[in-house]
Amino acid sequence: MAKSKNHEYVVVTYLFLALFIALIGYFIYFMVFQSESFINNPYNSLQNLFSEYVVRGDIESADGYTLATTKTDSDGNETRSYPYKDLFAHAVGYTGHGKFGLENQANFLLLRSHSMYANQLLNDIKGEKNPGDTVVTTLNYKLQQTAYDALGSHDGAVIVMEPSTGKILAMVSKPAFDP
């Protein structure tokens, strides 16, 4: 009787140990492999916390054109600027409530800072924000402009893709909007 009772305790102990290990593995999976998707989730209010410490990084085309940048006025107010307006509107997207496009997909990267640790510490001491990382896209300005011009006044969409790699070189949609 004592052996079977002891055996039941051992089985229950191992069962709880296995469940505990599975739970720890589940947490590690989400913390290591899924953290970026949780941070990018538009319902995540911690995104606002990141933006308090980091100036959102730039988005650039493959050929070096700045598609989105953050401008800071003398009062410290930040405004997201899109120099090419509706030319890259659908591809780059916009920030704010309901953001989409690269602004949404690369949110984690844009709000991350890889500046030198000493500079980050110095900025923290001075109460200044660290610069966010720059995201370089596969979009090509000249191809984008050509596709935009080819659509003319017609509504529609044009996507130019490099078939061997899957890189999107141009992505235009009309009617466009001014982000």
What is each stretch, according to the model?
Residues 1-179:
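Periplasmic/cell-envelope proteins involved in peptidoglycan metabolism and beta-lactam response
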